[in-house]
A protein has these predicted regions:
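Beta-strand-loop-alpha "switch" segments that mediate conformational coupling across diverse proteins
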Residues: 156-161, 165-197
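Inter-lobe coupling/hinge region of RecA-like P-loop helicase motors
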Residues: 187-209, 213
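Structural beta-sheet core signal
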Residues: 36-37, 94, 118, 152-154
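P-loop/Walker-type NTP enzyme "switch/lid" segment
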Residues: 2-15, 22-103, 107, 193-198
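Long, low-complexity, intrinsically disordered segments
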Residues: 235-268
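Inter-motif core of Ras-like GTPase G domains
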Residues: 104-124
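Conserved C-terminal guanine-recognition region of P-loop GTPase G domains, centered on the G4
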Residues: 130-145
Length: 268
């Protein structure tokens, strides 16, 4: 029985869904869990990445291959077919297609996953585009027979930039849960497609994995310190603050997590 099922979702392509899915699958697998990565995007980016990585020059196939299973399932019936396919896996991660072009497939993935992660850069346009994703999640809740949680993963963040803190405040004010860890803008991530995962970039993704485990404790049987997703979601849009002006939101500033955890868990 799957312990954690996660879908990466967004309205548009190019938001970091595939990158997030592959790196997360890698760190979960490195921690000793059985991982299934589901490529639900008709473009097959995750599967292509896997194929290219396995042929990486200078490495034997067994060294270059991803340390987890990957299957292609771009289907509107994903939520019906995946339980049998994933019945022996501890973690299932679904790389969904962009909702604007493949809504049926994306909805099927949202019906299956217990946690929905929305990758989002700290920019006004990307924050505003999370609203249709939230609307899809709300519709899916009506037809599910078990709870679903959702959170935003801030990615492509510039170190010490105010935009990251402003984006977190705006998202919280809009009613979202935002993971404590942010993914910085690094070349190791931007240039990682088609090559084996480099351990030098895994530190951040281990922290993201810890955040997810804490959030999903009620579903996965792991102790959680994450807050509940209760409360309403205001249907507002974010406007960036003017230079020198006050923040447009009243949410408390949350400092992004940095540095490795000292908990002694496999995610450190």
């Amino acid at each position: 029985m799957t312990g954690l099922s996660l879908a990466l979702a967004n309205l548009k392509p190019g938001t970091g869904k595939t990158t997030s899915a592959v790196w997360l699958a890698h760190v979960f697998a490195q921690a000793g869990t059985s991982v299934l990565l589901v490529d639900a995007d008709p473009s097959g980016s995750a599967l292509e990445w896997s194929d290219l990585a396995a042929m990486y020059p200078g490495l034997a196939p067994e060294q270059a291959a991803f340390p987890f299973r990957i299957v292609a399932l771009p289907s509107r019936e994903l939520h019906r077919r995946l339980p049998e396919i994933a019945k022996h896996d501890d973690v299932v991660i679904i790389d969904t297609p962009q909702i604007e072009d493949h809504a049926g497939i994306a909805r099927s993935a949202l019906r299956y996953a217990d946690e929905i992660l929305i990758p989002c850069a700290p920019s006004p346009i990307e924050i505003n585009r999370t609203t249709p994703v939230r609307d899809e999640i709300a519709e899916v809740r009506e037809v599910r027979d078990k709870p679903v949680r959702s959170a935003v993963l801030l990615n492509r963040c510039v170190a010490r930039a105010h935009s990251t803190t402003d984006a977190r405040e705006a998202l919280v004010d809009l009613g979202y849960d935002v993971l404590s860890t942010v993914v910085p803008r690094r070349e190791v991530y931007a240039q990682s497609f088609g090559v084996p995962i480099k351990h030098a970039g895994c530190d951040v993704w281990r922290q993201v994995a810890r955040d997810l485990i804490e959030r999903c404790a009620p579903l996965c049987g792991v102790r959680s310190r994450a807050r509940s997703e209760s409360g309403s979601c205001a249907r507002r849009r974010w406007r960036p603050r003017r230079a020198g002006g006050p923040s447009p939101t009243r949410a408390r500033r949350a400092r992004p997590r940095s540095g490795p955890s000292r908990s002694g868990s496999p995610w450190t």
